[in-house]
């Protein structure tokens, strides 16, 4: 029984992918807060499926008001081997494209994201425990 347990643990450990954590930020138009929350309360199954297919897990989005502006902070973990290729797969997905065509106009990209023609800006991880 001990050998079986050890082998099972080894298989689980050997097959696990390294996890890379991502934090991203963007602005949110105040008049779109309710609609944005409603959309995410009933996120489309096809969008959620694609998120899983491209090796993203533990995906969360938070809302914070700072002064008179609203910001979205997202956190997710990536377990794949080629982030750029997986993000291209997500961007090529027609359901995801439709979702983004609704959500992107609600958001206010930070200046850095505008230059890069993106909506979300990556954040630097400064601590993890």
Segments predicted by a language model, with ranges:
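Short beta-strand micro-motifs enriched in acidic
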Residues: 62-66
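An amphipathic, aromatic/His-enriched active-site/gating alpha helix that lines ligand/cofactor pockets
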Residues: 50-57, 77-119
């Amino acid at each position: 029984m001990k050998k079986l347990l050890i082998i099972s643990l080894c298989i689980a450990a050997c097959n696990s992918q390294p996890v890379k954590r991502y934090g991203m930020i963007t602005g949110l138009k105040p008049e779109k807060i309710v609609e944005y929350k409603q959309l995410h309360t009933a996120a489309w199954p096809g969008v959620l499926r694609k998120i899983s297919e491209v090796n993203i897990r533990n995906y969360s989005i938070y809302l914070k008001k700072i002064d008179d502006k609203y910001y979205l902070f997202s956190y997710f973990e990536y377990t794949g081997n080629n982030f750029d290729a997986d993000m291209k797969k997500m961007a090529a997905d027609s359901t995801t494209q439709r979702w983004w065509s609704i959500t992107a106009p609600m958001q206010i990209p930070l200046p850095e994201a505008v230059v890069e023609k993106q909506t979300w800006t990556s954040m630097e991880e400064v601590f993890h425990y």
